[in-house]
Amino acid sequence: RTTGVCVLPEDDGHRMAKEFCRCDALVIGTPVYWGNMSGQMKLMFDRVVPAMMDEPKNGFPIPLHKGKRAVMVTACTTIWPFSWICRETTGTLHAMKEILGYSGFKIVGKMVLSGTRKRKGVPQKMIGKGRRLANKLLHV
């Protein structure tokens, strides 16, 4: 990590790290598995650590994305309110918030869709919320 670039051969991890560095704002989403983010999302975050924060010798992380805004999105098959009571979605949001926070992103909102197994599409209410959050990302 001394160079700020992963030493593994060039792959999607390197490409994602570059995208994080180039972005002005971020919309990040994951399905909920066992009360947390998907394994693919966790692996991606593990691979892009050098692009998200610097780790000086004193051990205190230095966020590399201060001033950038982010929206978090989750979906799970567990119906509300059990998705909240059983900490399905809250565990996922907490994990993403912690990673993005240490990286310097300001969370401007979240979208949570529970009970997806029985849904035939995205409810209009969620589409409206998505538009409002997009405006929050675009307008400081």
Each predicted region: which residue ranges?
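Local cysteine-cluster metal-coordination motifs and their immediate loop/turn environment
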Residues: 1-8
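Glycine-rich phosphate/pyrophosphate-binding loop and the adjoining helix
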Residues: 9, 82, 86-140
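Helix-loop-strand module that forms the ligand-binding subsite of alpha/beta enzymes
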Residues: 8-97
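Glycine-rich, flexible loop/turn motifs
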Residues: 2, 60-61, 107
